[in-house]
């Protein structure tokens, strides 16, 4: 705040006290409203998330971000970061490329496919997050991972994963890839995850359609421990119907279902 007049600094402090927003957001909102405190706070409360994101974007040093992209870009194709660049990117963050943290970053970048970021995905993604250095991104990661506790955001993350994981041009997701990603994103969230994966590997052995992928999350959220609340007449994919038929004797200790 050292470049501000004392009267402006006072307004920044008042804005922060009133809204609980950070200094960067406060300065952005006040400058957008010509330092009229009442109008700035009204604007913030009408759309706090949007204004916070806008202030984050404006704080990014574009030249610094371009230099950072240059560290990772593919030497054969300057419009993307390839496998080697992704590995360096993960190393700089001290992350395993197969970790859920890297998948969260890919989600935030809206990456189209595994093992690469396009130039646009990287630059737009980092800008949206307000990051122009790996230090900033690393510091932000815990907050990004916390977003997965929000039901709507996790659903978006989960559905993004299907598109990200499948081969471009294919409608379905290869079974082995689906199982690997389910282990990553549904561990601790879907009580029948191990049983589901065993069932697929033993009895399905085919690719997974998008509809089945998406509805498995709904199934996992609603199904009872003994599966007694499953409605065979509901609009579930056949694969989930078959799984319930396979799994019920297992989860009920071998007893036959009355349904």
From Swiss-Prot:
Tissues in which the protein is found? Mostly expressed in liver, kidney and brain.
Q: Which UniProt keywords apply?
A: Cytoplasm, Nucleus, Phosphoprotein, Ubl conjugation pathway
Q: What is its main location?
A: cytoplasm
Tell me where it resides.
Cytoplasm; Nucleus
Q: Which PROSITE patterns match?
A: DCUN1 (PS51229)
| Organism domain of life | Eukaryota
A biological process from GO: positive regulation of protein neddylation
Task: Please report the stretch or stretches of sequence annotated as the DCUN1 domain.
Answer: 60-248
Q: Name one GO molecular function term.
A: ubiquitin-like protein binding
Q: Which InterPro entries match?
A: DCN-prot, DCN1-like_PONY, PONY_dom, UBA-like_sf
Which residue intervals define the domain UBA-like in the entry? 8-45
Q: Does the keyword Phosphoprotein apply?
A: yes
The protein's matches in SUPFAM superfamilies, at most eight in alphabetical order, are given as:
UBA-like (SSF46934)
Q: Which residues carry this modification: Phosphoserine?
A: 55
**Domain comment, in the record's words?**
The DCUN1 domain, also known as PONY domain, mediates the interaction with different cullins. The DCUN1 domain mediates the interaction with the N-terminally acetylated NEDD8-conjugating E2s enzyme leading to the NEDD8 transfer from N-terminally acetylated NEDD8-conjugating E2s enzyme to different cullin C-terminal domain-RBX complexes; the neddylation efficiency correlates with the DCUN1D5-cullin and DCUN1D5-E2 interaction affinities.
* PANTHER family cross-referenced by the UniProt entry: DCN1-LIKE PROTEIN 2, RP42 RELATED
| Description of how the protein assembles with itself and partners | Interacts (via the DCUN1 domain) with the unneddylated cullins: interacts with CUL1, CUL2, CUL3, CUL4A, CUL4B and CUL5; these interactions promote the cullin neddylation and the identity of the cullin dictates the affinity of the interaction. May also interact with regulators or subunits of cullin-RING ligases such as RBX1, RNF7, ELOB and DDB1; these interactions are bridged by cullins. Interacts with CAND1; this interaction is bridged by cullins such as CUL3 and strongly inhibits the neddylation of CUL3.
What role does this protein play? Answer: Contributes to the neddylation of all cullins by transferring NEDD8 from N-terminally acetylated NEDD8-conjugating E2s enzyme to different cullin C-terminal domain-RBX complexes and plays an essential role in the regulation of SCF (SKP1-CUL1-F-box protein)-type complexes activity.
Protein name in UniProt = DCN1-like protein 2
Q: Which organism was this protein described from?
A: Homo sapiens (Human)
Name the gene for this chain.
DCUN1D2
């Amino acid at each position: 705040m050292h470049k501000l007049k004392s009267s402006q600094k006072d307004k920044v402090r008042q804005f922060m006290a009133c809204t609980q927003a950070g200094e960067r957001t406060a300065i952005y909102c006040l400058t957008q409203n010509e330092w009229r405190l009442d109008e700035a706070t009204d604007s913030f409360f009408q759309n706090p998330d949007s204004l916070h994101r806008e202030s984050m974007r404006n704080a990014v040093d574009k030249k610094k971000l371009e230099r950072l992209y240059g560290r990772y870009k593919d030497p054969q194709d300057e419009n993307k970061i390839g496998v080697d660049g992704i590995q360096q990117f993960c190393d700089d963050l001290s992350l395993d490329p197969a970790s859920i943290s890297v998948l969260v970053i890919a989600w935030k970048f809206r990456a189209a496919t595994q093992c690469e970021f396009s130039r646009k995905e990287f630059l737009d993604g980092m800008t949206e997050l307000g990051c122009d250095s790996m230090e900033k991104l690393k510091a932000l990661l815990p907050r990004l991972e916390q977003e997965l506790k929000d039901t709507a955001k996790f659903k978006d993350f989960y559905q993004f994963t299907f598109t990200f994981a499948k081969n471009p041009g294919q409608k379905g997701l290869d079974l082995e890839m689906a199982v690997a990603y389910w282990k990553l994103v549904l561990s601790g969230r879907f009580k029948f995850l191990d049983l589901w994966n065993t069932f697929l590997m033993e009895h399905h052995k085919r690719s997974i359609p998008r509809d089945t992928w998406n509805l498995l999350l709904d199934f996992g959220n609603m199904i009872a421990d003994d599966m007694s609340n499953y409605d065979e007449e509901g609009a579930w994919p056949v694969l989930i119907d078959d799984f319930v038929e396979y799994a019920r004797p297992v989860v009920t200790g071998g007893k036959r279902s009355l349904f």
